[in-house]
Amino acid sequence: MNNHIEALSYYLGAFVDELTRLNVCDVVISPGSRSTPIALLMEQHEGMNTYLHVDERSAGFFALGIAKAKKRPVALLCTSGTAAANYYPAVCEAFHSRVPLIVLTADRPHELRDVGAPQAMNQINLYGTFVKQFTEMALPEASEAMYHYARMTTQRMIASACLAPQGPVHLNFPVREPLIPDFSLESLWDKGRGEYTGVVQQGNAVMPSEYVDSLVGRLSHMKKGLIICGDDSHSEIATFATQLAEKTGYPILADPLSNIRSGHHDKTMVIDCYDTFLRNELLKETWKPDVLIRFGGMPVSKALTQFIKKQTKAVHIVVDESGQWRDPALVATEVVQASDIAFCSALIEKMPVMKKNDWFRMWQHINEKTKETLREMETYDTAFEGRVITDIVRVLPEGATLFASNSMPIRDTDSFFFTSDKTIQVMANRGVNGIDGIISTALGASMICDPLVLVIGDLSFYHDLNGLLAAKLHELNITIVVVNNDGGGIFSFLPQYEKKEHFESLFGTPIGLDYEHVVTMYGGSFSRVNGWEQFREEVQKGATTEGLHVVEICTNRDENVTLHRKLWAKTQDVITTSLQGESK
């Protein structure tokens, strides 16, 4: 028997088997020659689920979506050359959104590097600082020591991806020809296997009792507090944060991605309209918290970030399991390295019950006044983009997922996703906030989250049209709501809008595309709605039937800005009147 083929088969077989033993059971594969042995072994292993995606850029985001939804590592596999470079945007997003991806790139052997060989480039540390760890795997050798090495390296890399903060890792595999493994070999998956795996298990760190006692003592004298919950908070944060809020009397400013705004838990302490009322100058100048406790990433709301930045005299506690200093407002006074749950549990156990005071009632009152005013948009006959969110939430069933694209959809979700007793999971790519790969990420998530509705602008939709292929290949169920304002709607809210001479060509960027034929090409249904009743019917139909459904609602960018500002202005008047009335 060819010793090379035996070494290739057993060495890479040990690697693939170890992935499955470590619960990495999903891999997104893009076709290529140099990655052949790994791809074939993955397809052959009964413990591995393989998904084909021919476009590596889309494949990267597709894997990201699966990993976000499953909350566990997902592997990516491609051949050498620019194929690997196309993963870069998804790797960047995974790193900053703390999603564990196992990036596997095949490569030419060392003798074919830097000598002009085809499809060969430097793949060492290809993703730079956007992966937690890189390793160049050794060439396959036929020895028990090397089979064990393959498994131990796999364990190290998976541990790195899964320990806080989670993130992507990169393994580069140089492989010599011939590339076809021998599946007739006995015990193909058993080489190098030990009785136990060596992955580090991370639990919730125990809070030091001295710090907890000190903090409880301080908080007991701080009546004006805020609990701020951003994205990537722990899945059980709703239960623990609301219990902490009840103990302290501090309102919870819940980002939509915290998933605290919806569900069966008590939402008495939850504030959902802060993005609107924190624009009020009188409120910002007069409401001064003593302490802010923040979980998860920075919230979507710019108004909230600016409010936080002004609180230079407050105690500002950032809770982060990894201990990273995530404080773009530059006002944190303490960073506590602990899980959200460990932190909340420790305080809940020892905090005395602090009665709800005027501070909480002020936030609750202004929140309700703001919500009443914002709901006036439900009387608008025109296609107002904010109403897209409220009408989707209205028809989504219990347990559904709303995926919000970047740019305007996530901001409208922040402003118009009000508290609901239905459990509706909200997802988005808020690592580096790009508009690329949104369709692919949502489709990856839809493999686990069903039904899933994606809200996306026309430019973001165009940007990732290739991603629709996954819906066809893997028979996925998704409803995509395309808010088509023929351009980049968010720029109409920014100072660039005043530069009328060059605005449309540089920022508005209308592309004037009809997406109907593209959607049908990928086997989906397409509907362009006129009116809110038809909109709700189409979204509901899409969420309750199988397949790819695209619902397009056309809006006017200028009109949308006017309506947003009209709502904000009326809300500011209501808030100012209410605040002035309270001060008398």
Curated annotation (Swiss-Prot):
State the pathway, as annotated in the record. Quinol/quinone metabolism; 1,4-dihydroxy-2-naphthoate biosynthesis; 1,4-dihydroxy-2-naphthoate from chorismate: step 2/7; Quinol/quinone metabolism; menaquinone biosynthesis
Quote the record's cofactor note.
Binds 1 thiamine pyrophosphate per subunit.
Any Pfam family from its record, for instance, is TPP_enzyme_N
EC number(s) reported in the record: 2.2.1.9
Listed under catalytic activity are:
isochorismate + 2-oxoglutarate + H(+) = 5-enolpyruvoyl-6-hydroxy-2-succinyl-cyclohex-3-ene-1-carboxylate + CO2
GO molecular function terms attached to this record = 2-succinyl-5-enolpyruvyl-6-hydroxy-3-cyclohexene-1-carboxylic-acid synthase activity; magnesium ion binding; manganese ion binding; thiamine pyrophosphate binding
What keywords appear on the UniProt entry? Magnesium, Manganese, Menaquinone biosynthesis, Metal-binding, Thiamine pyrophosphate, Transferase
- Specify the domain of life of the species encoding this protein: Bacteria
Q: Which GO terms describe its biological process?
A: menaquinone biosynthetic process
Q: Which Cys pairs are S-S linked?
A: none
The cofactor named in the record is:
Mg(2+); Mn(2+); thiamine diphosphate
- Into which EC class is this enzyme placed? transferase
Subunit architecture: Homodimer.
**Which protein family is it in?**
Belongs to the TPP enzyme family. MenD subfamily.
Function, in words? Catalyzes the thiamine diphosphate-dependent decarboxylation of 2-oxoglutarate and the subsequent addition of the resulting succinic semialdehyde-thiamine pyrophosphate anion to isochorismate to yield 2-succinyl-5-enolpyruvyl-6-hydroxy-3-cyclohexene-1-carboxylate (SEPHCHC).
Identify this protein by name: 2-succinyl-5-enolpyruvyl-6-hydroxy-3-cyclohexene-1-carboxylate synthase
Where is the organism placed in the taxonomic lineage, from the top? Bacteria, Bacillati, Bacillota, Bacilli, Bacillales
Provide the gene name from the record. Answer: menD
